[in-house]
Amino acid sequence: MAYTSPPPSRSVLSNKAHRYRILLSLRSLLDRYLSWPLPPGPSVEIAIPSKVSKTPGSIQLYFFTAPSRPLCPRKQTQRLPPRPVLINFHGGGFSIGHARDDSRWAGTVLKAYPDAVVVSINYRLAPERPFPVPLEDGADAILWLWQEAQKYNFDKTRFALSGASAGGNLALAVPFRLHEELQKQRWASIGEEIELAGLVVFYPSTDWTRSRIERDATNPIAPQKSIIPPSLFKFFDDSYLLPAGLPKWPGTDRVDMSHPYLSPGLAPESLLLATYPPAVAIYTCGWDQLLVEGNTFRERLGGFVEEGKMASIGGFVVEDVIHGFDKKPSFCRGNKARDRMYGDAVNQLKVMWKID
């Protein structure tokens, strides 16, 4: 993806981000407090220090649990079955949004699996913290949860990731960064009994080699139906994709937009098979500029299943809906398309978590 003009200053982008965040938070409030059935709120919030990123700071983790199964340190005398964990990344173009925006998805998971724990990551946002900070915060959160697994009775072998839009990109790319980090001696204390059980991803970006115009061209109905104006897409890209921090082609100063950390759909087969769990589900939207690249990646992973290299690939196209359709306040009308997508995704988790 080439820049045709210098991006705006970081201060200008930060001012825009502040305004956009206020608007999105209002929409989220309408969904969380005025749309039925009401989703749950987080039961616990914990701040952890960033260790993976070179940019110091803290990362907020929001824990969602069923009322009957609160999050609390396990007593030595307790012998309860370890709990499966879903680690979620919210959307918002890496620049806006909040971990609470996915409360409805968390509630759907907990209704089906009351013993589960959903952890929504409030990763640090661009333009203040552009690529690769959100990606590194995701790896940091997983590493911390693995380290604390015994204390909170988490099942280290049943960690699944989920995310929508930009969060979907993170859910698909974080395993690569996590794999790189785990090669370092500093994480030896985590132990060997760790692995990701699955990925559940909603309308992700998977191929940053395509410009926004090129993405629209792959699905011409998308710009007609989208409620996201081109100016907002440009803001997202300018905020997150700060050229100085982007991957470069080896031995050059040219930005490599095909790098797996940006474009997980283009990752080499060897990396995918070394880092991905055996089960992945990708859901795409029929009226979305990201439809084709998401479908292409799902089909590519499906080829690994046919070759016996992965266990299962799920997900489908949700027809006649726009990007982010499940986050719109529904008030008393409900959202049948969202319910169908979330319902299927919950069934995918049953397979990933090996729940009878």
Task: Name what the model sees in each region.
Residues A2-K51:
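An N-terminal hydrophobic leader/cap segment in hydrolases
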Residues S9, L13, Y20, E45-D356:
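Alpha/beta-hydrolase superfamily serine-hydrolase fold, recognizing
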